[in-house]
Amino acid sequence: MLNGIETIFDNTTQMLRHLKKKSFEKNTQDFIDSYGHYFREMTEYVDSISDKERAAEEIADTLINRVEKKFASKKGKIDSRTQVDLNFFMIYYVFPTILGTEHEYAKLIADSICSAWGERFKESQIQYTDYDTLYGSFREKIFGIF
């Protein structure tokens, strides 16, 4: 399940750099085009299992295990700067993409990942929202000033 999902984090630094409304829109579409199949796989997996909560927990465990394997040092820890970037990436790209599937159990999947993420990673009690809310939070340029 979710083989290779850790690759969604390959361009984390680039996708978070100079994050503006226009670049966020483009980055999100590129992210969905490249990695949307992982999020469809998540929803299909939940559909295929009778215990939906357990299925969502398994998805969360799989994702987090792959993140730890990719980013942890030899001591088994993720450095604090990388963790902050991963947290922001989850908030800006991963959770909105999950919710963007508009699947019946998308919120359950997001809740499970969010909860497990906070338990597993130090100082990572993050929240999530959908794409439209995030997109709306970016300011428009006013007379080219902002």
Model-predicted segments: where are they?
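Alpha-helix capping and inter-helical loop/turn segments
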Residues: 50-51, 100
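Residue-level detector of alpha-helical secondary structure
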Residues: 2, 6-20, 25-50, 56-75, ...
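Basic amphipathic recognition helices
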Residues: 68, 72, 76-111, 115
